[in-house]
């Protein structure tokens, strides 16, 4: 049996997302917000995987030879479920499950914070990265690489320009090291990379690549600032202790916010 495009991405994220959820749970714990890691991990992975699971069920129904009756039954059920109903259903079930796990403490203090923290983890680490899978299902792996290159080049450009020319602080109370010069330099770097990448994608004009790079560069840096906000609130410098990187969340922060923007840009251009 063959598997849908993006299987490698799906399996990689199915491993990485629980690690990121664990780091998010630790950040929330610093603020005395206790969430169920198990509930949030399972829910985040399901929300992230739904486009791939939908495609897998279609392929299984189109080529059922060798599949077990149970697999066919599950694929048939999944195929009848509208995807835009599945994610809200998972989130609602996760909310009930998280509050149910919280009630085992036999305390009411922090129930609303638990609910909010659980949904934050699921949306941030399940729904947002899930946009990369429909992109991969409709485009080549090179498209995913291009998106990540634009986002990460914005990070590197912001760091380099900020170090060389940074004078005016961007948001000193949130991220003292970031400057307006670095912010603009990072966006410009992503725009240049986006224009250059169109050389390998003839279906896009250079100006479309430039606009995509500029927008994804902005989103990537906003994603970095969003994670800085969470870490500042928790009172920590890094989300984890991965040598040389900090934590899994520190690696994912910029690509996460860029994912839905990239998806809708491609929908606008290609339909």
Per-range role (PLM):
Residues 26, 158, 227-230, 253-256:
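Hydrophobic side chains within alpha-helical segments
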Residues 100, 222-237:
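Transmembrane alpha-helical segments of integral membrane proteins
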Residues 154-157, 184, 249-259:
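Membrane-embedded alpha-helical segments of transport systems
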Residues 232-255:
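Interfacial loop-to-transmembrane junctions
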Residues 264-271:
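Juxtamembrane boundary at the C-terminal end of a transmembrane helix
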């Amino acid at each position: 049996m063959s598997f849908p495009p993006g299987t490698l991405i799906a399996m990689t994220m199915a491993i990485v997302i629980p690690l990121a959820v664990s780091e998010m749970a630790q950040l929330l714990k610093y603020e005395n917000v206790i969430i169920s890691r198990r509930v949030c991990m399972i829910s985040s992975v399901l929300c992230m995987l739904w486009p791939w699971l939908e495609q897998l069920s279609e392929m299984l129904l189109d080529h059922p030879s060798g599949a077990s009756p149970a697999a066919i039954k599950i694929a048939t059920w999944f195929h009848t479920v509208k995807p835009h109903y599945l994610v809200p259903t998972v989130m609602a079930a996760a909310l009930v499950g998280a509050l149910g796990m919280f009630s085992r403490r036999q305390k009411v203090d922090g129930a609303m914070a638990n609910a909010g923290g659980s949904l934050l983890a699921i949306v941030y680490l399940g729904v947002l990265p899930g946009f990369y899978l429909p992109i991969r299902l409709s485009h080549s792996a090179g498209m995913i690489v291009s998106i990540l290159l634009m986002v990460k080049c914005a990070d590197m450009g912001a760091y380099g320009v900020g170090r060389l020319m940074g004078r005016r602080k961007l948001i000193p109370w949130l991220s003292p090291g970031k400057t307006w010069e670095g912010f603009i330099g990072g966006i410009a770097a992503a725009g240049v990379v986006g224009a250059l990448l169109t050389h390998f994608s003839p279906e896009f004009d250079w100006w479309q690549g430039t606009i995509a790079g500029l927008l994804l560069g902005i989103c990537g840096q906003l994603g970095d600032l969003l994670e800085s906000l969470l870490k500042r609130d928790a009172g920590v410098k890094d989300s984890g202790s991965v040598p040389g990187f900090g934590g899994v969340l520190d690696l994912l922060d910029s690509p996460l916010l860029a994912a839905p923007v990239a998806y809708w840009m491609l929908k606008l251009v290609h339909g």
